[in-house]
Amino acid sequence: WDVDLANAIGAKLGVTVEYTISKFDNIIPSITGGRYGLGVSSFTDTVEREKQVDFVNYYNAGVLWAAQKGKTVDPDNACGLKVAVEAGTYEDTDELPAKSKTCTDAGKQAIQVLKFDGQDQATNALVLGQVDAMSADSPITEYAISKQSDKIEAAGKTFDIAPYGIAVNKGAPLTDVIKNTLQALIDDGTYTKILTKWGVQDGGVTAADVNAASKQ
């Protein structure tokens, strides 16, 4: 649904959005290097990432784990388990390292984090039983479950709720342009229609913001 939102922003501005598929952890360096104008990839806005780029906030999401159907996995008690993630995501860089450290500090086995270049690969690893669980942002996990509901299911509830943001080069005038355009889409109902189409209304916002993570 990120693509639908980006297309709506482009349409409102009278421009056509051009897309380049990239590994998640290459997107921010490509923005700061001038290769991409925007990064639209379900980015969790964090204070650390705000040091490199600005974020136009458009959604609130959390982390949601998934496990194979019928298997019980507790995200808060995952020591020694194999967990799939997409490389460079919040789950890879923040959530799982912290959880794994808690395990080892308590004398337990570390979480075995299996990193994949794409979310589809991480999901497939779970479907095939190569890992015990996967961790991803809640809309991503919910979508994966909807497509593989006979094989995987949610493990626990959504946690660590945080703002999503469209990444823009630090200090670029484009940031305010995107924010104002997003607000126009919220006000005219287009934004809600997109969220409803994809079944992700729960994290919708009523006002666009910039760098919300540093304001929390």
Predicted regions and their residues:
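Extracytoplasmic small-molecule ligand-binding "clamshell" domains
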Residues: 1-42, 188, 197
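Periplasmic-binding protein-like
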Residues: 60-67, 91-96, 142, 146-198, 201-216
